[in-house]
Amino acid sequence: MGMSSLKLLKYVLFFFNLLFWICGCCILGFGIYLLIHNNFGVLFHNLPSLTLGNVFVIVGSIIMVVAFLGCMGSIKENKCLLMSFFILLLIILLAEVTLAILLFVYEQKLNEYVAKGLTDSIHRYHSDNSTKAAWDSIQSFLQCCGINGTSDWTSGPPASCPSDRKVEGCYAKARLWFHSNFLYIGIITICVCVIEVLGMSFALTLNCQIDKTSQTIGL
């Protein structure tokens, strides 16, 4: 009974982490694609690392490393790797909770910081081709103009702005999109946390099962 339970747990955790690792590869690949083809980061000279591509590359890399430890620890029944996997997942979970709290506490300050970065980038629109391309992409995609409206463009709105003079600003449009999709974002976040907790539970259970099996066969 002990050996069959051990095998079941081992393969469940292995395939769980294999799927986790594949997801990490996809996220990393998408992040690299964004870094190559997406130039929105030029809008934030005050926070140059604030790009979706950088975030996806970092998250994808971390997921791949953690999932690799989980795969190797489960298939080799290595308690050291399993505990490393557990600790890393725990750190990631705590980091996510901390980040959520910080975003909630400093939401206003972050909004001001982002708004300042966008305001500075508007002044570079006619002198920097990358900034121009980024703004044109955002305004065309969101059907918005400037940060708060057409008045942000002192020399007149560019061609990428919608023709409607009462069009919304891109900052308000982006915030509206976020709030309208808040439920889905919340569900995805909760699912990720549940998966992490399940991974930690599987790792601990397998670790305990290895001990029990070792004692049973007299190792």
Swiss-Prot record:
Transmembrane segments: 12-32, 55-69, 81-106, 182-206
Residues bearing carbohydrate: 129, 148
Location of the protein in the cell: Cell membrane; Cell junction; Membrane; Synapse
Gene Ontology terms: biological process: positive regulation of myoblast fusion; receptor clustering; signal transduction
MF-aspect GO terms: identical protein binding; protein-membrane adaptor activity
Tissue expression profile of the protein: B-cells, monocytes, macrophages, neutrophils, single (CD4 or CD8) positive thymocytes and peripheral T-cells.
Coarse class of the protein's main subcellular location: membrane
CDD domains, per database record: CD53_like_LEL
Disulfide cysteine pairs (residue numbers): none
Keyword Cell membrane in record: yes
Extracellular side: 33-54, 107-181
Family: Belongs to the tetraspanin (TM4SF) family.
Name the record gives this protein: Leukocyte surface antigen CD53
Organism, as annotated: Homo sapiens (Human)
Lineage: Eukaryota, Metazoa, Chordata, Craniata, Vertebrata
GN (gene name): CD53
